[in-house]
């Protein structure tokens, strides 16, 4: 019902959603695009509902993700984990319950101070530390000797004059490059985080390695690998990506 209201009544960024889907899947018919559009708004409604009831949402880690977390704890190394706006990305704030290592995530403070306070409080409830995006580089460089896991949502549009151009969903796309630059500067390991819905209110998080020594990689490799992995997640089930974001401008 909420999905119908958002997509059909409010028509929230409907034209952006349809245009993005058509650009990403030019081989699909109009009917097939509409099916993905409908499923997207239904899933968006679920994510919105879950974010209003975060205590009811459960996070599970795949076997490989648990192995990765355990290995990182033993190595006591710095790690950067990249993810996109796919599924309910807010559930990563529950990751501290699976590790003793400090966990951090970048965020952009909201202009409304009261809403920012509520958002900050909800996201840090389980021990996740939030770093304001504009200060993240300075903070992480200062703490580079401290083993930690830092999450970056890395599929935002960075502007045509910034970022790295990659082939993504049938078109040249500029990807946020700040995470890669930081990873190479700190010589961290880098991984890709994927989220899959399980039962209602349950998500499974998986981690796939991108590299162990970022400083040894060529420029753009990490970003291109991330884009490729995210594209595979989207192709598997397009309805969980945030199609209402003005990704291609």
Describe the predicted segments one by one.
Residues 21, 123, 182-183:
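Structural element of the ATP-grasp superfamily
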Residues 77-134, 157, 161-162, 167, ...:
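Catalytic core of membrane glycerolipid acyltransferases/transacylases, capturing the structured
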Residues 51, 87-93, 233-235:
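Juxtamembrane/interfacial segments around transmembrane helices
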Residues 1-83, 118, 127:
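Membrane-anchoring hydrophobic helices of lipid-metabolizing enzymes
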Residues 3, 18, 92-93, 119, ...:
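Generic structural marker for isolated residues within well-ordered, non-membrane alpha-helices
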């Amino acid at each position: 019902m909420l999905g119908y209201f958002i997509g059909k009544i409010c028509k929230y960024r409907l034209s952006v959603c349809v245009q993005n889907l058509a650009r990403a899947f030019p081989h699909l018919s109009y009917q097939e695009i509409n099916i993905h559009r409908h499923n997207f708004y239904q899933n968006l409604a679920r994510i919105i509902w879950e974010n209003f009831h975060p205590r009811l949402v459960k996070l599970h880690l795949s076997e490989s993700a648990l192995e990765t977390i355990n290995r990182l704890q033993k190595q006591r190394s710095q790690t950067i984990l990249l993810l996109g706006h796919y599924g309910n990305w807010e559930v990563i704030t529950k990751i501290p319950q699976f590790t003793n290592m400090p966990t951090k995530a970048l965020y952009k403070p909201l202009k409304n101070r009261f809403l920012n306070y509520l958002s900050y409080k909800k996201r840090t409830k389980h021990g996740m530390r939030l770093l304001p995006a504009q200060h993240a580089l300075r903070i992480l460089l200062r703490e580079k000797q401290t083993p930690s896991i830092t999450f970056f949502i890395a599929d935002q549009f960075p502007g045509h004059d910034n970022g790295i151009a990659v082939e993504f969903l049938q078109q040249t796309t500029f990807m946020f490059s700040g995470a890669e630059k930081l990873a190479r500067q700190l010589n961290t390991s880098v991984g890709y985080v994927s989220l899959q819905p399980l039962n209602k209110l349950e998500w499974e998080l998986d981690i796939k390695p991108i590299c162990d020594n970022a400083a040894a990689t060529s420029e753009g490799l990490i970003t291109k690998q991330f884009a490729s992995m995210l594209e595979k997640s989207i192709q598997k089930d397009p309805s969980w990506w945030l199609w209402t974001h003005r990704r291609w401008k």
